[in-house]
Amino acid sequence: MVRRIASATPMVQSPMSPLGTTYCVRPNSVSMNLQRRPLVIASTDEAKVTIIYAGLLIPGDGEPLRNAALVISDKIIAFVGSEADIPKKYLRSTQSTHRVPVLMPGLWDCHMHFGGDDDYYNDYTSGLATHPASSGARLARGCWEALQNGYTSYRDLAGYGCEVAKAINDGTIVGPNVYSSGAALSQTAGHGDIFALPAGEVLGSYGVMNPRPGYWGAGPLCIADGVEEVRRAVRLQIRRGAKVIKVMASGGVMSRDDNPNFAQFSPEELKVIVEEAARQNRIVSAHVHGKAGIMAAIKAGCKSLEHVSYADEEVWELMKEKGILYVATRSVIEIFLASNGEGLVKESWAKLQALADSHLKAYQGAIKAGVTIALGTDTAPGGPTALELQFAVERGGMTPLEAIKAATANAPLSVGPQAPLTGQLREGYEADVIALEENPLEDIKVFQEPKAVTHVWKGGKLFKGPGIGPWGEDARNPFL
């Protein structure tokens, strides 16, 4: 059993170690654990301030600036403006300096799934067939790739994001900020049910009323029926560390035997889910395709709608009136259409084909109507997330600047009151910043080339750039 180092634990350091590393020996019931802990040594030449000069600065919300500069002090953006207007106190301080062609906020993907499933399975059975340890290993790689590709934040809407976020936050692995729902909530015979397996098998693993001794209840799905079960389901996700609650409010594509046009959960169940989430200062994100599910989710008070395939003018006006975020997830549809449904069971492929055109029309209509939109792909960490920017422009009808706003400034709205102060290059915001060698306003597909992302700062720390190792470490000393 591996445990974190406690401050009271005796420390033993090897004075001859060339790694400058402190070790902790901690006994437990299984073994004597030898753990490495970075030795932090104060340095008089340590950079206190980072100054980035940019030929073009895209703020996330607002017009781009030419010949601009941005100053990071610790983790916070301290100055944004003309290169000529940098306060002298920053120029006099100890600093690291970078000059880049294009600077902008780090990207968000607002609809991810931290499943880490085995590719051998092509339906929901993979969630039960894959060991969580294997899932975690795959997710660690994907999170590293995400940061290298310029994605500094993910919203996970069904998966192990709560658990992976802890490993990222304590520095065990490298990845974006992760804001997770924990398990997605589904009714029996709903979008989160696994129709290929016996009901007892599914409920025994994912049923909210069936926790086993020693079981964390930390799967990607949670089956609940009735107001008391859904109330408990919300509380269990918050116990895991969920920053948002995800509910399956209509049938879906990947669930083999349900109908995307039909609403799921009763109005009373949806109301309790929203109320219980609000009690803990969380919003609810609803998976919806058909209008019945869309309207039920809106009436219940859900603040983020996913897919929204059969939306119309009535829906768009209600979303604007109530300040509801629209996350279309066009990428997953385009990917399956291009591959002729490769990887889908026949029932899912038929459903996707049936709703693909309506989904696109709804997306285009929402953009024209002025609904607030954030971008999400419905894929996994490290996947082709930048495709969503391309489809927002080429299929949805956004301008490149609008697509960037949807992937940056609008994105924190997807976690409601739990949102960090990020997504924009503004003074006082967290320094989640990326640099590009090409102008995305001229070619939105530039985000699809990882080499085009030359620098990545997350929370003010440089994770990708000259002199930085592949895991965000100082290449001169990988343990600092």
UniProtKB/Swiss-Prot annotation:
It catalyses: ochratoxin A + H2O = ochratoxin alpha + L-phenylalanine. Detoxification of contaminated food is a challenging health issue and ochratoxinase is a promising enzyme that hydrolyzes ochrtoxin A, a mycotoxin demonstrated to have nephrotoxic, immunotoxic, genotoxic, neurotoxic, and teratogenic properties; and that occurs in a wide range of agricultural products. Its main location: secreted. The active site is at K246, D378. One of its GO terms (biological process) is proteolysis. Gene3D superfamilies: Metal-dependent hydrolases (3.20.20.140). Keywords: Carboxypeptidase, Hydrolase, Metal-binding, Metalloprotease, Protease, Secreted, Zinc. The keyword Hydrolase applies. Optimum temperature is 66 degrees Celsius. Zn(2+) 1 binds at H111, H113, K246. SUPFAM superfamilies: Composite domain of metallo-dependent hydrolases, Metallo-dependent hydrolases. Its EC number is 3.4.17.-. It is found in: Secreted. It comes from the Eukaryota. GO terms for cellular component: extracellular region. Belongs to the metallo-dependent hydrolases superfamily. Ochratoxinase amidase 2 family. Each subunit of the homooctameric enzyme folds into a two-domain structure characteristic of a metal dependent amidohydrolase, with a twisted TIM (triosephosphateisomerase)-barrel and a smaller beta-sandwich domain. Carboxypeptidase that catalyzes the release of a C-terminal amino acid with specific catalytic activity for aromatic amino acids such as phenylalanine. Is able to degrade ochratoxin A, one of the five major mycotoxins most harmful to humans and animals that is produced by Aspergillus and Penicillium species and occurs in a wide range of agricultural products. This is Ochratoxinase. It comes from Aspergillus niger (strain ATCC 1015 / CBS 113.46 / FGSC A1144 / LSHB Ac4 / NCTC 3858a / NRRL 328 / USDA 3528.7). The gene is Am2.
